[in-house]
Amino acid sequence: MESLQSWGDFDRRPSVSEDPNEHHYVLKSREEVDRLLDFVLQEKEFGGHREAGDYLVAYQVDLACWLSYPETGSPVYHNPGEKNARIAIAIYDRDSLHMVHGLQVWVTVLDEHGNEVGTAQHPFLYRPGRNQYGSDWQLPGDGKYNLRVRIEAPDSLRRWNGQPYSSPVDVEFHSVEICTGHKVS
């Protein structure tokens, strides 16, 4: 697998983070953005993605599994119980492709006939190397579903170039094939 360092000449600019060692890559062309995007999405095994507002939104579906959510001190693990599918949403800055943290993300699942299965807030998932917003779901069974993702505009989060993520974003993924069950650990 090709490493990011071998991808060419990326400009680096300081971020607005309090950490002076944190930098963001400024991609010089759409071709570089597309190459980096292909790497990120292939590496993370996402099923699809869309650009929406200031974000690049991607989804991943899998069997239900133990999930870990960050809480004070250390991650807390949650058993899926009767839930039979995991839906995860990754949200990147559209321009820098950095993961955007601190968002309120809501997902609505609709069956293939357009009937609402449910709506749930997806908290941030702590998964080393695969940080996402996600949750286990109880779905009627295997099949094609539509996913509606709502990302609320944050109160204080700002992009590296000083422009806020200023408005809520809605994005839909259609005919997402979801297999239900539990991962064996």
Kindly give the residue locations of the regions a language model identified.
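Exposed beta-strand and adjacent loop surfaces of beta-rich binding modules
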Residues: N84-R86, G102-W106, K144
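Short structured motifs
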Residues: E43-E45, T72-P75, Q104, G118-Q121, ...
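Short beta-strand elements
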Residues: W160-S185
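Short, solvent-exposed, Trp/other aromatic-anchored flexible loops in extracytoplasmic proteins
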Residues: A90, T119-P154
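Non-globular disordered terminal and juxtamembrane segments underlying protein topogenesis/assembly
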Residues: H23-H24, A64, N146, D170-I178
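Short flexible loop/turn segments that cap and initiate beta-strands
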Residues: D93-L110, E116-T119
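Beta-strand-rich domain onsets/edges
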Residues: W7-R86, V184
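Beta-strand-rich structural segments
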Residues: K83-D95
